[in-house]
């Protein structure tokens, strides 16, 4: 009878007690000896019943040798119980909540019934139990004291009498606890507290603490250090009497007491890390033992960290053999090929099973052996099941069917190619090997266009390559991991590969119109030569004579006709920046390809460059597949490179030199910048710089200098006037997008400008007031702070060179420091989202818990999208009617059609105008990503059919309209199935919404007025193609979309964090690159956020367009504390007297005059009788008061209202220039306590506290708003004619700090358009759905143009808000979202703590996701493994055919 099998559904964690250890143990350790002679000592810690790691003897338990024996645990019977070191806190909780006399609970269990199970015992133990009387035996519960000197010792304080609780006493107490009490306190029966005190401990198997015996017999031996710990434990245990009985309150001998403590400490060291080599550490009472010069190892030490068992062995994947080398470029190789050195090919072996169909192919390998390539190294003989070295075979050895031949790698084998760090799934791709026969080559070679998959370059990068062994592995590798699958990026939905650098420039030069000297005009033979290396079907040149001339466009069109597409877009070559300085050929300012024919324009980065979304290769991939796109990239690359080799292209120093006139003009521009900088210096010296509120004078001065020293756009004029754009190689590389940018060109030819480090000029850190040794102290000229006047071609002076190196060093250091942070952030994201998998309904769920009702809200794969334009969005009502309303036939159907188009337009506007209003910088646009480009399909159908179609009758037009209407109605059934479509079952609302954008586009592109020249047959073909492409664009079942989202966000976020420190001549942002992402993903509360902002629109439309009024409102909401208005303050101790004509402190003698005037002018504000001798004298900042429109009267009124125990006097507000406004605040006796002997010290403390309260008093504004400035917005609105109008003159208030509720209470603020960057503030006021939207918008705002497809952002937001609260991607957030997935949380971090908590709670871990099945040794249910394959073995057996029968059939 065969044993059945099943998958493990769940794993339960429990605390192991004595019975568990005894049941699992195969023997009892009784002695500490290791060996007796050459064999392990029986009953010793190396007893052969626990396994073997030695080839001299077998395991007694399983009779296996060391390679087959898994090991078996033993037990050590303790003479005295020991506490379980992992659960000391749990032991203390139980001692606090149960009676030490009868074991009954001391607390009222009903008080904790409402809590979740894991929290009950914790809450009960945290309550006050000392002195409580037991409900059962009436005993008074003592105070439980934790020994500060010994981690494992507890004391009880019973009315002043302190007794020690030995483990034996604790065990007796816990034995009286009933299972009912355990369950009511939230613990499982399997976690009974009696298990926390052990009488029998488990000894691990030999296999996890192996020993190495050097020599035979009594030769030297080396054993694992943990064996020494076990030896000590056994020896100390033997020193304890077997019949030792300890009674509570009884004194025991000191030597036994010490031995008990030592045993407990040894058991702790055996399980957990030794904390120190000293007696104690930090007062914790944990003592460590030392083995030689290092702390003793432990069992739990093997779990955590990168080198631990979990991350290194269980989660990590290892291969038998792998090769690694430096990579270099080789454009002769196809993108899916990799050049492999022959020395590597002869070392790395491929296992191939001999079959009838391949024995003749494998025989040459077998005969060559190791002598000649291609050969083999060994053979596995199926009959004998043995492996034979190829060089030791006998002459009569025969290669037979079923044998396995380990042959050399040959051209055509598939191999995995990988570069670390593997931040995206394209970092591991499958290539076809091309063996490089040259023995001098020892590097991997790859096409330069293939680098984008791996984010690699050729500056010394190394990559790994390994070959799958089995046939199944090779087939799976080619189908699942082929680089053609990675051609479209999951992150950006655009193509990853394309032309780079030389081939981009070559494509441009080849396709230009009127190239100088006619370099891209060639005869038939030259054109044929360009196609020699393209590896495509050569075009037909039979129609051309040898004297006919072909231009580059014609040659490229011959290649494009093999994959006919339609393309129209402005090239990168044409730029408005260059237009004033150069002449553009009209035929080169727009690239147009019609049915594979390059009609006009050039091919540059926008058309054929790497990562060009909507480019030529993207269109080819969408229509003909990614494999054809890769072939076209290679073919175009070969054309371009062959042309460049023949025509020539170079960049020389002559391309970088300016003419004398241009150089003079550049110097004039630089001198103007330096002059403006000098004027700012003069303003600083004369005190004329008035900083805005929130900035110091120094900060504002630096900001003015940075703005003044930026190169203006007109610096391009002398550069462009001194070069010839038609022949200048440097300019052509920049203009075509091949390499470089305008700032690079300016740095090389004109000047470098201001060097900035972290958005600041070079600071004087060399010494006090000096930036470098070359400049004097307190120098003010711009050159002393990093302004470089020279260009790279002109050469740099010594200080200029040092300034440039400062910036480079800063970038290097930041990259090194940020790598660890971003790497860990990536790992947390992977673990946080890896359980999110698409099910059969295209929902995203964690096991059975729903995360998204439909993936990405539309169920589409991010790789299957392309950008299209919705024509109706920007049209007014009249324009829409003129363009889309069909009036040829009077029918209510066409009125209905136009009404539907108008509703679609208005719905689109409503949705994305709301998005615009509630985001900082996301404006409405009519461009969206959709799975089907309907206009392209229509154009292709029309171009592929006969032209000159006659107008159709009314019946045909109505029939086409009905077809489109029915198709749009049934489109959501694509998410369900054809059966439901035939039955016309109701469609869920969320599925209708998922298809709404696509239905809008179909109605626009297939409107009646646009399809008059289409037949019904063509319309049917168009609709079928739309449905096919839409179906193919849906996300696959079992897709691990959580990991895809983590990779797609983490990789660009990593780059964003690194790039945030890199500054150019244009300056950069002042936000730290890592702070804001951490705030978002860590779900920090409002008070912990450092960079929260608000955008406030004004309620009154008239005020919204007036900057002055807007600034007044901004001033009114900005939080102004009294401290911000003060220049300086003094706390004085002096006797007040109204008749006194002077004051105690001579420095303030002038105060007497205004104080006298104050008393005369304010007869009702006379000093009170209880005025004290403490006075606070303050000088106000008049500049701040003027800028913030704060009057002295408002300040005084606010202070008097908030501080009634004071008497306030002040000078007049309109003082002369240079004379400050002074306020004196006298404290009253009521503010102090009753007089004591220490009156002076006490009063001083009280006075200081009053000063603190005064300074923090709010004068005006909303709490939380640290700063408020007026900003100009760009927004859209719909006018009366239905036209979408862009408004550029709207002013809003941008704040530093957030308080949505406070802003809503202000009558000037529009409460419906308040935008806050704070996720916590949004959550508190608007709820979880608003917080979800805020997470999406904030990630998009932070990442900007580097942001991934919005589906990945939705994945983040939905996961973080799934529980109804905003949870972080940190460990705490994972615990909240997946509390039952112990294995996943253990794999992330702190495995010992996670396992301990799981055992205490008796947690049950369902096996789902990725980490849990991997740790259990099974394959996760994702991808192609998501669906079970059912095989009909009976059918296969009945229809099995042998090779002979198949040959007979043929």
Curated annotation (Swiss-Prot):
Keyword NAD on entry: no
Keywords: DNA-directed RNA polymerase, Nucleotidyltransferase, Transcription, Transferase, Viral transcription, Virion
Family annotation (SUPFAM superfamilies): beta and beta-prime subunits of DNA dependent RNA-polymerase
UniProt KW Transferase keyword: yes
GO CC annotation terms, alphabetical: DNA-directed RNA polymerase complex; virion component
Catalytic function, reaction form: RNA(n) + a ribonucleoside 5'-triphosphate = RNA(n+1) + diphosphate
Source taxon at top rank: Viruses
EC number: 2.7.7.6
Gene3D superfamilies found in the cross-reference section: 1.10.132.30, 2.40.40.20, 3.30.1360.140, 6.10.250.2940, RNA polymerase ii, RNA polymerase II, clamp domain, RNA polymerase Rpb1, domain 3
GO molecular function annotation: DNA binding; DNA-directed RNA polymerase activity
Cell location: Virion
Induction: Expressed in the late phase of the viral replicative cycle.
Enzyme class, broadest EC rank: transferase
Primary localization: virion
GO BP field: DNA-templated transcription; viral transcription
Free-text note on domains in this protein's UniProt record: Lacks the typical C-terminal domain (CTD).
Similarity section: Belongs to the RNA polymerase beta' chain family.
Record's function text: Catalytic component of the DNA-directed RNA polymerase (RNAP) that catalyzes the transcription in the cytoplasm of viral DNA into RNA using the four ribonucleoside triphosphates as substrates. Forms the polymerase active center together with RPB2. Part of the core element with the central large cleft, the clamp element that moves to open and close the cleft and the jaws that are thought to grab the incoming DNA template.
Subunit structure comment from the entry: Part of the viral DNA-directed RNA polymerase that consists of 8 polII-like subunits (RPB1, RPB2, RPB3, RPB5, RPB6, RPB7, RPB9, RPB10), a capping enzyme and a termination factor.
Protein name: DNA-directed RNA polymerase RPB1 homolog
């Amino acid at each position: 009878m065969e044993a059945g099998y099943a998958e493990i559904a769940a794993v339960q964690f429990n605390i192991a007690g004595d019975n568990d250890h005894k049941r699992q143990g195969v023997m009892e350790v009784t002695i500490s000896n290791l060996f007796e002679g050459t064999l392990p000592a029986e009953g010793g810690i190396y007893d052969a019943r626990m396994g073997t790691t030695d080839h001299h003897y077998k395991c007694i338990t399983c009779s296996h040798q060391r390679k087959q024996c898994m090991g078996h645990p033993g037990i050590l019977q303790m003479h005295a119980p020991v506490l379980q070191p992992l659960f000391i806190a749990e032991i203390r909780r139980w001692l606090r909540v149960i009676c030490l006399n009868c074991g009954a609970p001391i607390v009222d269990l009903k008080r904790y019934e409402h809590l979740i199970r894991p929290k009950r015992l914790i809450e009960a133990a945290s309550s006050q139990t000392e002195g409580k009387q037991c409900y059962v035996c009436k005993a008074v519960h003592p105070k439980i004291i934790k020994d500060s000197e010994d981690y494992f010792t507890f004391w009880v304080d019973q009315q002043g009498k302190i007794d020690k609780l030995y483990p034996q006493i604790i065990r007796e107490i816990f034995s009286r606890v009933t299972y009912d009490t355990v369950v009511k306190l939230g613990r499982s029966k399997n976690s009974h507290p009696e298990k926390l005190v052990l009488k029998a401990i488990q000894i691990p198997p030999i296999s996890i603490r192996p020993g190495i015996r050097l020599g035979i017999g009594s030769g030297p031996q080396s054993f694992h250090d943990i064996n020494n710990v076990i030896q000590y434990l056994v020896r100390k245990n033997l020193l304890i009497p077997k019949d030792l009985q300890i009674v509570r309150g009884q004194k025991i001998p000191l030597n036994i007491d010490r031995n008990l403590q030592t045993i407990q400490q040894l058991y702790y060291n055996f399980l957990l890390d030794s904390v120190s080599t000293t007696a104690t550490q930090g007062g914790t009472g944990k003592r460590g033992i030392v083995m030689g010069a290092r702390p003793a190892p432990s069992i739990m030490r093997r779990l955590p960290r990168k080198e631990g068992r979990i991350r290194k062995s269980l989660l990590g994947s290892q291969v038998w053999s792998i090769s690694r080398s430096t990579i270099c470029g080789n454009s002769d190789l196809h993108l899916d090929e990799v050049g492999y050195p022959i020395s590597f090919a002869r070392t790395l072996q491929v296992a191939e099973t001999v079959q009838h169909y391949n024995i003749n192919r494998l025989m040459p390998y077998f005969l060559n052996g190791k002598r000649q390539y291609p050969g083999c190294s060994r053979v596995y003989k199926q009959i004998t099941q043995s492996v034979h070295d190829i060089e030791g075979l006998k002459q009569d050895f025969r290669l037979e069917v079923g044998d396995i031949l380990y042959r050399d790698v040959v051209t055509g084998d598939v191999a995995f190619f990988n570069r670390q760090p593997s931040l995206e799934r394209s970092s591991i791709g499958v290539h076809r090997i091309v063996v490089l026969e040259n023995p001098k080559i020892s590097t991997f070679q790859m096409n330069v266009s293939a680098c984008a998959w791996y984010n690699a370059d050729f500056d010394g990068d190394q990559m790994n390559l390994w070959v799958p062994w089995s046939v199944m592995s090779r087939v799976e590798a080619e189908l699942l991991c082929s680089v053609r699958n990675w051609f479209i990026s999951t992150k950006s939905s655009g193509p990853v590969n394309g032309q780079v650098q030389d081939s981009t420039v070559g494509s441009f030069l080849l396709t230009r119109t009127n190239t100088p000297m006619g370099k891209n005009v060639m005869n038939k033979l030259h054109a044929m030569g360009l196609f020699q290396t393209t590896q495509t079907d050569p075009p037909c040149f039979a129609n051309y004579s040898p004297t006919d001339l072909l231009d580059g466009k014609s040659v490229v069109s011959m290649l494009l006709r093999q994959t006919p597409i339609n393309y129209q877009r402005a090239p990168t070559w044409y730029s408005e920046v260059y237009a004033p300085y150069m002449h553009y050929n009209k035929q080169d300012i727009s690239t147009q390809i019609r049915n594979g024919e390059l009609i006009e324009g050039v091919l540059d980065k926008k058309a054929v460059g790497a990562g060009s979304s909507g480019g030529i290769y993207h269109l080819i991939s969408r229509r003909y597949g990614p494999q054809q796109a890769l072939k076209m990239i290679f073919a175009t690359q070969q054309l371009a490179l062959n042309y460049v080799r023949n025509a020539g292209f170079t960049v020389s120093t002559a391309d970088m030199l300016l003419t004398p006139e241009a150089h003079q003009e550049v110097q004039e521009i630089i001198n103007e910048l330096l002059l403006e900088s000098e004027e700012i210096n003069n303003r600083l010296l004369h005190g004329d710089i008035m900083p805005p509120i929130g900035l110091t004078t120094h900060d504002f001065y630096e900001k003015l200098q940075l703005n003044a020293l930026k190169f203006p756009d007109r610096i391009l004029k002398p550069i462009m006037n001194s070069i010839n754009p038609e022949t200048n190689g440097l300019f052509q590389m920049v203009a075509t997008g091949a390499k470089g940018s305008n700032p690079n060109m300016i740095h090389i030819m004109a000047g470098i400008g201001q060097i900035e480090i972290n958005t600041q000029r070079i600071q004087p850190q060399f010494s006090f007031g000096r930036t470098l040794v070359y400049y004097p102290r307190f120098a003010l000229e711009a050159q002393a702070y990093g302004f470089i006047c020279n260009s790279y071609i002109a050469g740099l002076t010594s200080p200029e060179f040092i300034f440039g190196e400062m910036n480079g060093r800063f970038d290097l250091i930041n990259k090194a420091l940020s790598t660890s942070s971003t790497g860990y952030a990536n790992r947390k994201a992977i673990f946080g989202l890896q359980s999110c998998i698409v099910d059969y309904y295209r929902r995203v769920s964690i096991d059975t818990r729903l995360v998204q009702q439909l993936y990405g809200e539309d169920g589409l794969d991010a790789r299957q999208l392309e950008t299209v334009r919705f024509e109706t969005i920007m049209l007014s009502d009249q324009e829409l009617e003129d363009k889309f309303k069909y009036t040829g036939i009077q029918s209510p159907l066409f009125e209905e059609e136009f009404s539907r188009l108008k509703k679609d337009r208005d719905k689109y506007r409503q949705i994305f105008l709301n998005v615009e209003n509630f985001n900082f910088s996301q404006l409405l646009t009519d461009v969206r990503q959709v799975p089907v480009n309907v206009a392209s399909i229509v154009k292709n159908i029309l171009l592929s059919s006969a032209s000159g179609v006659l107008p159709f009758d009314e019946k045909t037009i109505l029939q086409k309209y009905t077809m489109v209407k029915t198709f749009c109605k049934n489109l959501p059934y694509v998410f369900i199935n054809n059966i439901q479509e035939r039955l016309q079952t109701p469609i869920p609302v969320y599925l209708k919404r998922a298809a709404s954008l696509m239905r809008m586009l179909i109605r626009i592109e297939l409107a009646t007025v646009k399809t008059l020249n289409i037949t019904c047959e063509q319309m049917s073909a168009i609709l079928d193609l739309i449905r096919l492409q839409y179906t193919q664009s849906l996300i696959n079942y079992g897709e691990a979309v959580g990991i895809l989202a983590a990779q797609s966000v983490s990789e660009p976020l990593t780059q964003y964090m690194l790039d945030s420190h890199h500054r150019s001549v244009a300056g950069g942002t002042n936000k730290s690159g890592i702070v804001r992402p951490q705030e978002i993903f860590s779900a920090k509360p409002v008070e912990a956020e450092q960079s929260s902002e608000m955008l406030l629109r004004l309620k009154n439309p008239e005020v919204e367009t007036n900057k002055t009024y807007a600034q007044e409102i901004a001033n009114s909401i900005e939080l102004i504390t009294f401290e911000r208005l003060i220049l300086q303050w003094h706390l004085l101790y002096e006797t007040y007297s109204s008749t006194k004509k002077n004051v105690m402190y001579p420095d303030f003698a002038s105060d007497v005059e205004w104080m006298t005037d104050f008393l005369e002018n304010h007869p009702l504000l006379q000093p009170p009788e209880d005025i004290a001798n403490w006075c606070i004298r303050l000088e106000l900042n008049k500049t701040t008061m003027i800028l913030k429109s704060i009057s002295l009267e408002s300040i005084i009124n606010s202070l008097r209202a908030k501080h009634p125990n004071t008497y306030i006097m002040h000078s007049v507000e309109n003082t002369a220039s240079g004379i400050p406004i002074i306020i004196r605040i006298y404290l009253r006796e009521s503010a102090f306590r009753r007089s004591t002997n220490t009156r002076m010290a006490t009063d001083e403390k009280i006075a200081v506290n009053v000063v603190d309260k005064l300074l923090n008093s709010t004068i005006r504004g909303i709490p939380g708003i640290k700063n408020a400035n007026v900003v100009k917005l760009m927004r859209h609105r719909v006018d009366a004619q239905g036209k979408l109008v862009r408004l550029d003159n709207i002013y809003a208030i941008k704040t530093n700090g957030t308080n949505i509720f406070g802003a809503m209470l202000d009558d000037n603020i529009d409460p419906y358009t308040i935008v806050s960057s704070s996720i916590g503030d949004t959550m508190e006021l608007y709820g979880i759905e608003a917080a979800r939207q805020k997470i999406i918008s904030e990630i998009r705002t932070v990442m900007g143009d580097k942001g991934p497809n919005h589906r990945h952002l939705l994945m983040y937001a939905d996961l973080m808000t799934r529980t109804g609260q905003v949870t972080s991607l940190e460990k705490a957030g994972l615990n909240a979202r997946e509390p039952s997935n112990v294995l996943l949380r253990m794999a992330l971090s702190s495995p010992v703590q996670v396992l301990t908590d799981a055992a205490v709670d008796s947690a049950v871990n369902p096996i789902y996701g990725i980490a849990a099945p991997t740790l259990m040794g099974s394959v996760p249910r994702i991808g192609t493994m998501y669906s079970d394959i059912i095989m009909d073995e009976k059918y296969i057996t009945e229809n099995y055919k042998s090779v002979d029968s198949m040959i007979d059939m043929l």
